[in-house]
């Protein structure tokens, strides 16, 4: 079993195709690992053993019959963040207000996974409605980092990252609103990609902030992440924000990058995301070593200035709560989910107020209040409108930067994983943890976090963030795969 659960997805898929191992064997090995370890890590909110084994059996039947398989990852199981709707298992978004709720339909991303023959092991833990940076805001308890059980795995998608690091699954799906894929990847020594906004369907992705949210792939290697990216990307007419454009050849880029030649690739180091208050020395040392490695691979490295990045955090934490305030108004106790106080003596308004008070956690309530205030008539122009203007300036900074470089790089996070409970009562400190990742969400561009070693400060994982323009996701994979090949694999400490 150990060989199976520690194998990369591409290797497992190849073995399935030649009947060296069955999808059922792989899926059972992952389920056994979940059963043996998840009491410790709490990566999963729901495990769908029967459904996953049935999907695996269907692929094995196709292999036995000599039929062509539906995708390059057919038969390789996956962990799905509990923010994507699934018709056959609960979708809670880490919130009490949706406890036990089952969607009548699959998200487009879920449907594409099923069509590709990928068994879904279950739904992973997350910060409530994707609001948080540590997975401590889940109504169902925190997830622990497999590298150190006293540390957080990042957020909001810490469950998906922990499942990969604990060898519970070879593939995972996350969503990224301000770094929720990339940041957990950095803290768990896994790979996570935020695709270009609009290239992966948001239909069935329960909204946090609609102009920022983006589903994306996670795995333990760059190639595995590319193979999963290829499965989930593509235009969806049911998503009004979906981009009708050709998906870049991310798999070809990953394979080309693995050769380890970056000659001719121009890499920019973002001055505003490299050093300053709040950055751990070990993270900066790891980043500088990564830049040296890129140079050794032939890349042309220069420093790039993005002056409005200094205002990105403030703009983000006005735009995001404003969209949260609007999106979460749908949880009104009338249509689905929790209902409190409906004893026939109270008005609909009273029932709604009681339900939202009982069903939402402190961080969700905080952001609803901030957003409602920012959108109010007396403050809309002073706060929300100004934040949107800063957002435009950040996008212009990036556009200007890409006129002289092909990709940008920075640390993914300013520090390694912090201790459980360390920042939970200090929301401003928690928000600062998204400093390096959220500018890409504001601009709609793409980004990757790839492991860049262990910090000399505490021995915990550090991530290198690679950024590229919209619809240039293939650049991430070329550079990421080249760096990964030079650095070598970095697996979990378990």
UniProtKB/Swiss-Prot annotation:
It catalyses: L-glutamyl-tRNA(Gln) + L-glutamine + ATP + H2O = L-glutaminyl-tRNA(Gln) + L-glutamate + ADP + phosphate + H(+). It is an enzyme of class 6 (ligase). GO terms for cellular component: glutamyl-tRNA(Gln) amidotransferase complex. The active site is at residues 81, 156, 180. Signal peptide: none annotated. PROSITE patterns: AMIDASES (PS00571). Its EC number is 6.3.5.7. Keywords: ATP-binding, Ligase, Nucleotide-binding, Protein biosynthesis. Pfam families: Amidase. SUPFAM superfamilies: Amidase signature (AS) enzymes (SSF75304). InterPro entries: Amidase (IPR000120), Amidase_CS (IPR020556), Amidase_dom (IPR023631), AS_sf (IPR036928), GatA (IPR004412). Heterotrimer of A, B and C subunits. Belongs to the amidase family. GatA subfamily. HAMAP family: GatA (MF_00120). This is Glutamyl-tRNA(Gln) amidotransferase subunit A.
